[in-house]
């Protein structure tokens, strides 16, 4: 069995820095390392529709936005398979079969489901598709026999449910499906980058995002208003770096080379932190450094995006080709699933012959 990695995003909006450090940057690294036999990256439009059923146009428009973000960030259709979830009907079929192997109470115990139901005010009227999406996620993974799923800690309950369903299927029918392992982000900051306002999560709905496609002026506008240390009222005052969003971002994005280029007075971030803590460093100077660091990183991403935007039909061709390739893989898995469940009636020649013999002997 080969090493297969699978990951994706809900296409409900353009991708931001939180997506980039949480998963996208790591995906590009994994793709380029070449340690995996196959890499699948998909846009989960079916899942996005579970809480956007009345607004399919939102999903339709954002498919291309996410695809552009994928490609401009460095994902290559030559090295990974990019596809759209809804174009793989085998996933829906496998979801139906897996639903028979899990109880409603088991899905209800998933803490991520509980949190998202509350966040969307679904307590009194939960759409069935939304409630059952963890089973659909399990099918997403199992259909491609993924061995590794990069995800945040909040997705561990989903991965555990996937493993349970895979084990139960294999025990009841045949050892066809593969139990996946989670790959967590390498550091705590990458697991959840705070919003520019200091809130725990960067979110479009909170208006605290910096998007990968934002121009330099927009980036500066967001950095300039970024939450810092509310007690650091004067430049001479000692500052606090803990909980200071500017320093959280510098921890995540800056390098020693950035200091040599943009603030040679300091050799690295540790030296700047020490000086800021001692007093004498203004917040605006730190924000200007962060702005330079972010734009240096985003410049090539924006340039690639501009190039891809000149040929949108080709982007759809890439997604179509990837979806066809992904469907071939999922279809092969489903052939094995149906055979294991003994519902491959027309391919089971032994069944046909035995039934014919039984009726001949009547």
Question: Can you say where each PLM-predicted feature lies in the sequence?
Answer:
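Conserved nucleotide- and phosphate/pyrophosphate-binding catalytic cores
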Residues: 163-362
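Pocket-edge structural micro-motifs
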Residues: 7-9, 84, 145, 195, ...
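Structured ligand/cofactor/substrate-binding pocket environments in proteins
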Residues: 15-24, 39-40, 45, 55-59, ...
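N-terminal Rossmann-like or analogous alpha/beta NTP/dinucleotide-binding catalytic cores
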Residues: 2-139, 296, 306
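Extreme N-terminus of proteins, especially the signal/transit-peptide cleavage junction
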Residues: 1-3, 346-347
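A broad detector of the eukaryotic-type serine/threonine protein kinase catalytic domain
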Residues: 10, 47-48, 144-149, 207, ...
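A short secondary-structure junction signal
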Residues: 109-112, 146, 174, 205
């Amino acid at each position: 069995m080969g090493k297969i990695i699978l990951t994706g995003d809900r296409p409900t909006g353009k991708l931001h820095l939180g997506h980039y450090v949480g998963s996208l940057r790591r995906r590009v690294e994994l793709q380029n390392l070449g340690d995996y036999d196959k890499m699948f990256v998909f846009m989960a439009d079916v899942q996005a529709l579970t809480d956007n059923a009345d607004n399919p146009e939102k999903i339709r428009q954002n498919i291309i936005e996410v695809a552009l973000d994928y490609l401009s960030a460095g994902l290559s259709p030559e090295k990974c398979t990019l596809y759209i979830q809804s174009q793989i009907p085998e996933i829906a079929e496998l979801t139906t079969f897996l639903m028979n192997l899990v109880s409603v109470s088991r899905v209800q115990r998933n803490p991520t489901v509980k949190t998202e139901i509350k966040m969307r005010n679904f307590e009194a009227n939960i759409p069935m598709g939304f409630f059952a999406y963890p089973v659909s996620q399990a099918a997403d993974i199992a259909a491609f026999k993924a061995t590794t799923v990069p995800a945040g800690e909040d997705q561990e309950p989903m991965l555990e449910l996937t493993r349970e369903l895979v084990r139960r299927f294999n025990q009841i029918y045949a050892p066809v499906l593969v139990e996946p392992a989670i790959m967590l982000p390498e550091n705590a900051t990458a697991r959840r980058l705070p919003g520019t306002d200091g809130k725990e999560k960067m979110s479009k709905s909170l208006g605290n995002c910096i998007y990968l496609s934002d121009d330099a002026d927009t980036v500066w506008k967001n950095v300039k208003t970024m939450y810092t240390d509310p007690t650091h009222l004067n430049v001479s005052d000692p500052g606090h770096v803990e909980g200071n969003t500017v320093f959280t971002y510098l921890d995540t994005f800056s390098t020693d080379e950035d200091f040599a280029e943009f603030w040679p007075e300091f050799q690295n971030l540790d030296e700047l932190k020490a000086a800021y803590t001692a007093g004498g460093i203004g917040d605006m100077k730190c924000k200007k450094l962060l702005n330079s660091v972010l734009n240096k990183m985003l410049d090539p991403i924006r340039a690639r995006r501009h190039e891809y935007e000149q040929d949108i039909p080709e982007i759809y061709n890439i997604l179509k080709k990837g979806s066809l390739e992904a469907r071939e893989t999922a279809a092969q898995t489903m052939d094995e699933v149906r055979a294991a469940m003994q519902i491959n009636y027309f391919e089971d020649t032994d069944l046909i012959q035995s039934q014919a013999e039984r009726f001949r002997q009547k």
